[in-house]
Amino acid sequence: MATYTTSDFKPGLKFMQDGEPCVIVENEFVKPGKGQAFTRTRIRKLISGKVLDVNFKSGTSVEAADVMDLNLTYSYKDDAFWYFMHPETFEQYSADAKAVGDAEKWLLDQADCIVTLWNGAPITVTPPNFVELEIVDTDPGLKGDTAGTGGKPATLSTGAVVKVPLFVQIGEVIRVDTRSGEYVSRVK
């Protein structure tokens, strides 16, 4: 099995920790004035979703995680599962609610997603970075009503709620950044 040392660490690197695949969210090399150098990392366990801060002594080796990231197309959802299809082989994968997580509110039919597989089963679903959704409910923006933070909540066609500028109305299509859940722009 492949291994990584602390010099290989970078955000996005996947490795095994306590028998569970993890991904490095952020890392920092620390060389104190006295003592051994170490790498301070923030990792997210891919199955449980827990975020941990872990320090590794310089030169420590970790086992590479045997995970695959596949570009799949979201097909449909039934009572308990979301179904994704490989665009070339037409192979179907089913992901449960735990694997889909917060990505559910950004999934549109035929959207290209990155699905992470471990032992052949989906463990995480990453939606596209930007999605275009229609606003189905929001307060009307009154002219001259700029005394607040300059935003209002809007419910989108998938059920997600995002903060939008006052000029955006019901029925308009907006672009949303799925990583932060923030409004980006109106779609012409």
Swiss-Prot record:
CDD domains: S1_EF-P_repeat_1, S1_EF-P_repeat_2. InterPro entries: Elong-fact-P_C, NA-bd_OB-fold, Rib_uL2_dom2, Transl_elong_fac_P/YeiP, Transl_elong_KOW-like, Transl_elong_P/YeiP_cen, Transl_elong_P/YeiP_CS, Transl_elongation_fac_P. Keywords: Cytoplasm, Elongation factor, Hydroxylation, Protein biosynthesis. The modification N6-(3,6-diaminohexanoyl)-5-hydroxylysine is found at residue 34. SMART domains: EFP, Elong-fact-P_C. One of its GO terms (cellular component) is cytoplasm. One of its GO terms (biological process) is peptide biosynthetic process. Gene3D superfamilies: 2.30.30.30, Nucleic acid-binding proteins. It is found in: Cytoplasm. Is beta-lysylated on the epsilon-amino group of Lys-34 by the combined action of EpmA and EpmB, and then hydroxylated on the C5 position of the same residue by EpmC. Lysylation is critical for the stimulatory effect of EF-P on peptide-bond formation. The lysylation moiety would extend toward the peptidyltransferase center and stabilize the terminal 3-CCA end of the tRNA. The hydroxylation of the C5 position on Lys-34 would allow additional potential stabilizing hydrogen-bond interactions with the P-tRNA. GO terms for molecular function: translation elongation factor activity. Pathway: Protein biosynthesis; polypeptide chain elongation. PANTHER family: ELONGATION FACTOR P (PTHR30053), ELONGATION FACTOR P (EF-P) FAMILY PROTEIN (PTHR30053:SF12). Involved in peptide bond synthesis. Alleviates ribosome stalling that occurs when 3 or more consecutive Pro residues or the sequence PPG is present in a protein, possibly by augmenting the peptidyl transferase activity of the ribosome. Modification of Lys-34 is required for alleviation. Belongs to the elongation factor P family. This is Elongation factor P. It comes from Haemophilus influenzae (strain ATCC 51907 / DSM 11121 / KW20 / Rd).
